[in-house]
């Protein structure tokens, strides 16, 4: 090589001088060829990747041109260099070959760079990481030649002037190109710039600067956050996961079958049952739940296992592999620093060492820590994004599974439990994925630590290793116990959330009956168990952490003791001690993290089991539902038998039924006859026993309990279909919605609350019907859609929509109905009884047969009178009038005084005119509605007052208020906080003492000139060192245990306050707040306060005191370091402050964007039969994926913000290491080896601690947001006090007299009055019927009596007491209501009747007897203890309503309110309820709100409401003779006098 350069290639003597240098030949060959070799080796792979990308997006940009121009300049410089070499080669002097080869190599290299840059610009448009690495390598290798040439020039050597100038210019160009490579092309895309960021920008996360700057200037909004790349979106992830999951799940199912065969267990043993909201109601009661409970616990053990983790690994193996490589590289570099520390101590101790050696060590130490930081942060980015994508995949997969889950499988999961899978379990998997590599990395680090410690201390290390081995089984036992507790705690969380879901769903019933304390006690009882388990969990976890924190200290004490005791020649000097201490510090991290990761894996394994069971459950089996295109029947049942549960008898038995296309078929039957089950079977919601159903065409479905989405009325009706104005107007007119839309603020753009909370029952049903009518389906399945509407509205809807001349005429219509007066108009009637068809045929055929139908018809006619006989008039003018508003008294002609024939004819003419004016009014409403819709679309910013119901979730901005920290610390307890801090301070005082004592111990050897000191001195050193180490552990244990108890009390306090306040919130709060949003507080936020926040606070305190103690020790050893610490501290704090605003707001956005995911899921599950019937699963899935992606982009941005900060703060830590090393080199003559070891061993530790402090600071502020969100709901305005000092007499109300004095009320302050000056007197024991069209204010009147709505003026006086002056529970506890929607809660029947256990069993059985349920309940195996499923879904609507009657009979208050209680039941159940009320409440005041006029014709008085005012009030006889609005309504119902109806 000497001949190649014509100079010396290598000379070791050049390094043995104060001014060492490398030979120029070495610099011009090896250091030139290293970067060029790197480029040429990787170039083929790079070009192949570019070729494979196949995307042609070439664009000439300034950056591209600038880089190409500078490379061309380098090309020109290489050409000049070559030409100069050729010019110099005159033959007289020998030109060394290096002069030719290097320019030629550079010429080829720069040409290759030009090609690569051009190709990347065409195809990838992202700077190459390997080109950036090439420029960095080239500059690093060139720096040696750079300084050699400068030295030569300084020595006046002009022989190389030309070459030197060319080199300097070339070096400058390379620096410029590297700087240009750090920038990326600007993009107009809404996606994060990470996809197009340069290599340097990627590793430093500089592409995120703009977001941090934006977040610092003003609080970030969702629009400010970059969108995520397509491959990270839910649709892309689930698509890939689904493919892999299907294969692995199939294998797992096969393995399950093999297991079952081996254990000789029958697969039929699995327990299933009814699902939630099956077709919204069931006429079948599933018996013997108790029998199946035992089976269920056994069955849940048998499900496909061990497939989820495999499927996730196969889905994300590329990212896992990349993060593995980065972590491996980081771990290897981690062990270079102890060796460099050893060399640096040796350098300081050696007085003859050259200064440049020390500087090299300092630079190497800085370089190693810097590269470590880059590797670590890139590794973290990969892992956290992996965790995010795993969570997204799980959430999206759970949602997707919910759309296809079979009813038998779905029954095992309540909405609350499934939301838990999406929120808690997916989060557990995300957490464990973030740190999954630590499982092998910790083992590797422990192994390498032991290896290097062996090199330092020899076999003595085995004593320490032995101790670690002994502690492994202890940790294993603790970990097993932790898992068991975790499993139990997850069950407790599920139970608590299940009850919370029910409470929030039935909050109105709780308020009506003043049952909040009972349900609060139930939640608190579960919460108590949950906190007890949480305490045990935290105690075991603390002991585990204590053992692992103490392990490195004990290991170092034992190792050093054994080392100095086994051989008197073994001297503990600074090099051995502090190199070992640095290795022990490295060992501390894996030993601390390994149990935490194992604990996370254990927790995640519980979640994996739960997810495997759910995702592995059976899907709907639709094989028995055959959809055909060419068939002469619309629907055909062929020997069809279906069941809700395979363990029970078939609900639908051997049904044979043919329905022709275009037919209107009515399905009738008594309660529990199987009407809704027949429909559910058609929809594929039931299990097939045998036979099949053939269906031709698409289906539209109207459920018995209307399912309404949270959105506008228009959105609900369109239901994803395109808007056709003419069709839309026809539908809303036909469904009698025009008057309602006129009254609603915003018209059809008015927002409907969750589950249609701000609509009346009738309005909900009509919106549900309009949704189906708007769809262009072939078959319409209508499950009693007319039950909740007024008689005249029902007739209008039948004529305009369902009947022979309605919008759906010509379509196949299957109508389940209790309104028998429509039956003469249908094509065929199907009579069901006990799941079989008793009779079928036309109305006339069945009447002629004189069978079951004819017999029941006559029975009902006796009870219902002319209303039942009324046929539907097809006169179009009258139909138009039916949907009009009730005419006011002024509209009735003055001469209508008597009911003579002449007057009747006159009235008919008046009615005809009224109908025509009603028709005109309908048209004017239609036009006004159009205007409203257009205005709403064109001027979205001008929101009509009251149009917006659901409030947008409030997002706090700016720094978390100090009051929130105080709120939490107050809950923790100030004394507890003081003692926790004291113990942490004592822990670190002991830590500093340990380091100082070790420093003094190592200095003994230097004082003794390398010989061993006296045994007594040695023993004292060992004893004190060990005592200080143990003291550290004891103080840490004390602080941790104290914090556990304190934080548990904080959790208990916050949950109690939250629950209490939510239960005391007024109904207006629940009207405007989605359930999912409230549940999120009880699920995610409470979980954070329980688990995450206490751990984060403990970690923050450890990190904070760790850094303070380290800096104190460094400053004690080298006081001059204070000068460096000040600017570095300012930089550290400023960067953190700069960042924290962004991180904090992103966490808030994360929390806010989570709620819609869960709300949408709850909404989807409750409306699954409708969604599946309309085949809209894909649309709902896309909507869910969109909401998940919105949340994802906040999470991704937050993850990146952490990396952005960490890389900058680690740079601060690395500078501390560099400055410490540099100062030690500069002041080496005044320092000893133990001081150097003492300073640097702590400085090396600070980088990691600084990083953790930043993360913990961010985590504390992030997690304290949970307290902020909980506090937001703790401070929600309460309704009036439950109990006040002014208590009514014990027997109040004694008479039941009710007096309304100019009573006014509105739903919310910004809305208009709904009751406008109601004044009337209701006497004791009077029976008052309240009538009026939908929206007239009937239900509002009920709400006022119970003070669900508070007065806006006037008063209500009951028995001489103003109800506003007493407590709510004193009022509500003395009144009784049978509500419109019969809501039951999960629990036994007894609890549903008497949650406070106030009544004896005898009283309850009597109430059941009077409610006509005694024989039914007595027939149940568990009787009163029979379990009711969530929402009472294992009871039919009729049975639920009878149970509500039982509640009323049991309470037997002096005042009873029936709020349209019989609207959704058949006439038989209606008759039963009316009979009981008439007999049992004869001495009570009864207010009945009814649609069926015959139910109130025996009332003492009737109140007619319209637009919030009383338009008529008097006895039925008076009102009929007045020929006012009530007379018109009675006329429509076929009732002309009180005598015509009998009840």
UniProtKB/Swiss-Prot annotation:
Q: In which tissues is it expressed?
A: Expressed in liver.
What is the recorded membrane topology of this protein?
Multi-pass membrane protein
In short, the EC number is: 7.6.2.-, 7.6.2.2, 7.6.2.3
Q: Which residues lie on this side of the membrane: Extracellular?
A: 1-26, 89-92, 147-164, 333-358, 457-459, 564-585, 991-1031, 1117, 1231-1232
Return the InterPro entries for the record: AAA+_ATPase, ABC1_TM_dom, ABC1_TM_sf, ABC_transporter-like_ATP-bd, ABC_transporter_C-like, MRP, P-loop_NTPase, TMD0_ABC
Q: Which GO terms describe its biological process?
A: bile acid and bile salt transport; leukotriene transport; xenobiotic export from cell; xenobiotic transmembrane transport
Amino acids binding ATP 1:
669-676
Q: Which family does it belong to?
A: Belongs to the ABC transporter superfamily. ABCC family. Conjugate transporter (TC 3.A.1.208) subfamily.
Specify the protein name.
ATP-binding cassette sub-family C member 2
